[in-house]
A protein has these predicted regions:
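Peripheral interaction segments used for macromolecular assembly
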Residues: 1-81
Length: 81
């Protein structure tokens, strides 16, 4: 799967069923030595959709449980970082 294939997918919290954002608004953290994806960096949004400077949620790759056709399911309760 290419990164462009994941753009626009909704990010859903597995336990709460909450919508956390759209991946097109997120960044990836990549290990420079291996080239592997380490985490998604998802900006948190303020009222009216304006970004809050410097605020983001780091989602380790191991917490991505499923990438479907229109959403990505993440286990936010399983973070050990």
């Amino acid at each position: 799967m290419r990164l462009s294939d994941m753009n626009g997918k909704e990010i859903i919290d597995l336990k709460k069923g909450e919508r956390m954002g759209i991946l097109g608004q997120a960044d990836l953290e990549i290990d420079e030595n291996t080239g592997h994806i380490k985490a998604f960096l998802i900006p948190t949004l303020k009222w009216f959709g304006f970004k809050k400077n410097g605020t983001e949620v780091r989602v380790p790759w191991r917490n991505i449980k499923k990438i479907g056709s229109d959403m990505i399911i993440i286990d936010f309760n399983d973070f050990s970082d």
